[in-house]
Amino acid sequence: MKFDLSAWPEVGLRQVRSAFRAVPLKAYPELAGYSRAEIHEGLAGQGGLFLASDMARLLTLKAGVRVLDLGCGEGTTSIFLARHFGARVFAVDEDLPDSLPLRASRAGVGGLVTPVRADARKLPFPPGSFDAVFSMNAFFYFGTDDLYPPYLLRFLKDRGELVIGSPCYREEIGADAPEEFLLEFPACLAVHSPDWWRRHFAKTGEVEVLHAELHPRGAEFWEDRVRFLLEDRPPEGMKPGMRNMVRAIIRMLNRDEDGFVSHFMLHARKGKPIKLQPNHG
């Protein structure tokens, strides 16, 4: 069902709920006891802790493993990984809030979450520091350069794992892409298809890509986020930037009838580097 933008911003929750799906809480037993606000608040982008849960399921997480949460925003995913798996999480973001240590302490994981305010391209860690890298709704902002995957992989131990979850296009967009799909332009130009991301990491010769697919709830995550934002606060109570973003997402969903705009997950394991022979031809 399409959303009637002619009524924007004077919309009712009945219309919102009839137009967009909500991710069912029962599909995520690890989030039992969480409110929908706790699943979404403090997280940029779509998917909330639903997407974080699915990403974590791909990793081999247990107490004591060292995880780099890269581009963690406010650190909500870092607290989640420490709380549910006992992981020692290094929460890295260049705009990390000062409130993270207190929030981690209140969640009972103050000793497991280490805040690190740093640029993703200038990580202050020695090689082989981590068992896993986790990056949700952030990697496309800094990781599309061909040289970035080899740089990042140096911080993983041998056989260490990496998981990325992010918005994506089902296929690569071209110059004729509908204007509605170019959300957050020009950042959207760094949003790619799962196949693109598979090649991006595989060509390093240093990893085995185990999974690079559209998320089965990829389109649903967009709808669920709109529902939450409008249920949490009516448009007239939003800041102009947020109100405009919600309207832009609705326009995109109205135009996208077959799930071209979605989300993906990539899971890779670091292996022995392939020694490429120089071409002197």
Can you say where each PLM-predicted feature lies in the sequence?
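Conserved class I S-adenosyl-L-methionine
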Residues: 1-59
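Class I SAM-dependent methyltransferase SAM/SAH-binding core
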Residues: 68, 74-122
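A short acidic, Gly/Pro-enriched loop at the edge of an enzyme's catalytic core
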Residues: 121-132
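A short SAM/SAH-binding and catalytic strip from SAM-dependent methyltransferases
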Residues: 132-144
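A short glycine-rich, Lys/Arg-flanked "PGG" loop and its adjoining helix->strand segment in the class I
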Residues: 146-161
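Short, glycine-/aromatic-enriched active-site segment of Class I SAM-dependent methyltransferases
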Residues: 167-188
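Short alpha-helix
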Residues: 189-205
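Conserved Class I S-adenosyl-L-methionine
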Residues: 211-281
